Amino acid sequence: MKVRSLLFGMLCMLALGVSLASCSDDDDDSLDDGGSKVTLPQTRVYILNEGSKGANNAGLAFYAPNKDADFISDIYKTQNNAKLGDLGQSMIEYEDEIYIAVYGSNYLTKLNAAGVELKRVSFVGDNDLSAGIRYIDAEDGYIYASFWGGAVAKINATTLEVVDKLTGLGDNLEGVAICEDMLYVSNSCTADYTYHNDVKVIDLRTFTLKETLTVASNPNTQMLEEDDKVFLISDDYSSAEGYVLQMIEPAKGNKVTKIGNATYMAANNDILYLVNSMTDWSTKPVTTVNTFFTYNIKTGQMNNASFLKDAPAELVSSTLHMLTINDNDGDIYISTSDFITNGTIYRFKKDGTFIEKFDAGGVNPNSAVFFN
């Protein structure tokens, strides 16, 4: 009887241990919502509304794709009792935290998964970085940021301390992407809009400039990494077919190849999703035609068939401001803007089926991050 009792007790303790371990694992999977004033579902989308220059009206909208919470037009203001600032330029998610570069106000902020501000760093008083933060990427515990004025900063992702800077890289630095321990940075133009045609390659292991690549004129904001390659759009105003889409291949000595024309791009599962917006400025009012298509990175084949199904008719002729994809489920998000009133977000399934459209909550929605 004592043996049976002992065995029973051991089994109970084992079961309790498994139960406690399971609960602990669940807790580890949860997001950091510390300090939140609202209850949020685990699946959530944040949309950065850039705002208008000088209007101090940048904002961060919250959207629940599973319809288990109400839309919040500016969750940053809700959570922090403050405005985000002037011109929200770019946003990334890194290690379940949100980083936003606010260009006009010239600072970088770190938020938890509920939009509560954890830290911020201002660059206003730094002579090397005072021209304004632009685009950001992250790797191995650091945020890398481009700045107008020709600088790149290496920032500790935890403390937001600037641990290193590279200056004299060019003029108005824009889009950034990390591939194979290298940071690729677009050198767009001078302050008076004399356009450059180069991309800077920085070795992140030493944080030194490795080389300068020649690309089409005015490499700009659109740059990303997919399948160990870097894709870049140059806003070449001399190109009659539209802005120039290029591929940089690190495995081939950073070979640069033009692969088409596009205005916006996003990537998922080795497919590049593209839109080419052609505007006729001679008409009153101006007219725009948007063409949606894809590029298979593995095969190198362009597919001119639209990746959208039953899209609202107005999307073909609207002014676009964002194309992004939720890596978790493949849903496609496209924004439109008139640069004055609130933008509109169009959401599609991975297969291109239209789901819905909704008010973006602010002016010029330019990026989104996803938590699932």
Question: Model-derived features: where do they sit?
Answer:
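A short beta-strand motif characteristic of beta-propeller blades
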Residues: 69-83, 117-127, 161-167, 208-214, ...
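Short loop/turn segments that connect beta-strands within beta-propeller blades
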Residues: 65-67, 112-116, 156-160, 203-207, ...
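Repeated scaffold domains used in trafficking and secretory/extracellular systems
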Residues: 34-35, 83-92, 128-138, 171-180, ...
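Structural motif
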Residues: 54-62, 106-110, 151-153, 192-200, ...
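Short coil/turn segments that connect the beta-strands within blades of beta-propeller domains
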Residues: 41-45, 95-96, 140-141, 180-181, ...
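Acidic, serine/threonine- and glycine-rich low-complexity intrinsically disordered segments
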Residues: 161-280
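Conserved beta-strand positions in repeat-built beta-propeller and related beta-rich domains
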Residues: 47-55, 100-104, 144-149, 185-194, ...
